Amino acid sequence: MSATFTQTILFTDTDGRARWRERPIALTEGKPAAMLSPLMPSGGYQLRTSPVGFRSEFHCTGEPQWVFILGGQMEIFLQDGSSRVFSPGEHFYSADTLPAGTAFDAQLHGHWSRQLGPDPLVTLFVRG
């Protein structure tokens, strides 16, 4: 039996703009009742809480990291005007880093995010 986990990835495309894509991660370990991915490296984790009304400016991710929504809702906006909403239990891999040697341009690069709804946003960031 072959199982997969879908990794939603926010990445920097060749034109410098942030975009979304999905990649399957094979769950090749464990037992049929509890399939696991291979162990992945990580560089630590951080917890964050953002109050109702939080909104960031356009920015790029400093280091690639998994973002898990623990409470509240988070909306991510891209330069093309599109957005995605993530709710508790959902996740994405934030890898829209600024290309080496490139100066940040808030009209081209990155994404911005905001808290949605009546509850503070609580997130877990896992580097790696």
Question: What does each of the following model-derived ranges do?
Answer:
Residues T14-F58, P64, D119-T123:
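A short glycine-rich, His/Asp/Glu-containing loop-to-beta-strand
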Residues M1-F11, G81:
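Short acidic, Pro/Gly- and aromatic-enriched capping/linker segments at domain boundaries
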Residues P51-F54, G72, L78, L98, ...:
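Short acidic (Asp/Glu) patches
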Residues E63, S82-V85, A106-H109:
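Ubiquitin-like/PB1-type beta-grasp interaction modules and other compact soluble beta-rich domains
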Residues Y93, T102-G128:
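A short hydrophobic beta-strand segment most commonly corresponding to one strand
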Residues D80-L98:
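Short acidic-glycine-tyrosine-enriched beta hairpin
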Residues G62-D80, E90:
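Glycine- and acidic-residue-biased ligand/ion/polar-headgroup-sensing regions
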